[in-house]
Regions:
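Short, Lys/Arg-enriched, disordered terminal segments
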Residues: 1-11, 308, 316-318
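A conserved beta-strand-loop-helix scaffold within acyl/acetyltransferase catalytic domains
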Residues: 3-53, 57-68, 114-143, 149-254
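Short, high-confidence coil segments that cap the C-terminus of an alpha-helix
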Residues: 43-45, 104-107, 273-276
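Aromatic (often tryptophan-rich) hydrophobic motifs at membrane interfaces
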Residues: 49-51, 59-62, 81-99, 208, ...
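Short, flexible, mixed-charge acidic loops at enzyme active sites
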Residues: 68-73, 296
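A gly/proline- and charged-residue-enriched helix-loop-helix capping module
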Residues: 73-121
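Short, solvent-exposed loop/turn segments at the edges of secondary structure
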Residues: 73-77, 139, 308
Length: 318
């Protein structure tokens, strides 16, 4: 059995880390330091690199909060990232080494959130099996996605198709302009305030992502004929075939025009033309999957969307 050596991540390894993500099947934009570093001062980073014979075989993006190792609190998901052909015996040894590290550092539990099933397919099944005996709870959240490979005219519900055929004189476009993103952010704050919450990202963090991730993220804005922003979305390109809507919002004064239908339809066509397979519309569950927001879920299903699950393993240290 080859010995597994652990190295704690520092920014000296940034390029090495991101290069490794690029050659793994399970790694996505949310695994990269170029994404995770937008809020590195928010959390106590405890990301790890696992090596065999001085070569990286796996990485774990993670932070520590209240004696809990979380992978990852600053992204939609985390999980151990490794090459598809990693042998089971090495995976088991990594699990054992991680256990020992947690014990030595008084870490009492691990929370590992895996990517959506459309992103990871069955890639993490071996790892989930390795962790299953230590896992005391699995929470599941569901998201809806549009299958862009089968997208065609009239794909949506009868009501949504009717809305799109009406001449509301709405136009949608992508933007990374700071002033326009600021207007989108103000609309987003107004939307979330009605639900007594606020955006996960500050405006500064949103602009950091837009400025540093090039074409991997952008804002889509829908305007009426007078130039008012009536709806919008912030989108991340997670992989080469999956785009993810992180925020969706609309101006309630224009709700009769259902502007979000236009925004999502435009984005679906936009990413289909770029060769993407999926547009993920985000989770429709609340309280870590305990409840489903049926009105939100029903809205997304009218785009002829499908469900994709995100699992979180809550793991005991023993």
């Amino acid at each position: 059995m080859n010995e597994v050596i652990v190295t704690k991540y520092s920014d000296d390894f940034l390029t090495t880390w991101d290069d490794f993500v690029d050659v793994t099947y399970g790694g996505t934009l949310h695994s990269k330091r170029s994404f995770l570093n937008y809020h590195k001062d928010k959390f106590q980073d405890y990301s790890l690199m696992f090596k065999v014979k001085n070569k990286i075989v796996a990485i774990l993006p993670a932070v520590i909060v209240d004696k809990k190792l979380i992978s990852h609190l600053g992204a939609s998901y985390g999980g151990l990232i490794y090459k598809e052909n990693l042998k089971m015996e090495i995976l088991i040894e990594i699990k054992n080494v991680l256990n020992n590290i947690c014990k030595q550092n008084n870490i009492e539990s691990i929370e590992m959130r895996f990517p959506y099933s459309i992103v990871s397919k069955n890639y993490f099944d071996k790892l989930k099996y390795c962790l299953s005996k230590q896992t005391n709870k699995v929470t599941r959240e569901i998201s809806q996605y549009i299958d862009l490979t089968s997208l065609q005219y009239g794909s949506y519900s009868e009501n949504f198709n009717r809305i799109l055929n009406k001449d509301y004189k709405l136009t949608t476009r992508p933007t990374t302009n700071k002033e326009e993103v600021s207007k989108f952010y103000s609309l987003l704050e107004q939307n979330l305030l009605k639900h007594n919450t606020k955006p996960t990202h500050t405006f500064k963090e949103l602009m950091y992502l837009i400025d540093n991730l090039n074409d991997d993220c952008k804002v889509f804005l829908t305007n009426d004929e007078e130039g008012h922003i009536v709806s919008g979305s912030f989108v991340l390109q997670l992989t080469k075939n999956t785009a993810h809507t992180f925020y969706l919002c609309s101006d309630y004064r224009f709700i009769k025009k259902s502007p979000l239908v236009n925004t999502i339809d435009f984005m679906a066509k936009y990413y289909k033309n770029l060769g993407f397979d999926y547009l993920n519309l985000g989770i429709s569950t609340e309280n870590k999957g305990e409840n489903i927001n049926l009105s939100l879920n029903n809205f997304k299903e009218k785009f002829n969307s499908y469900g994709t699950v995100r699992e979180t393993f809550h793991i005991n240290i023993n």
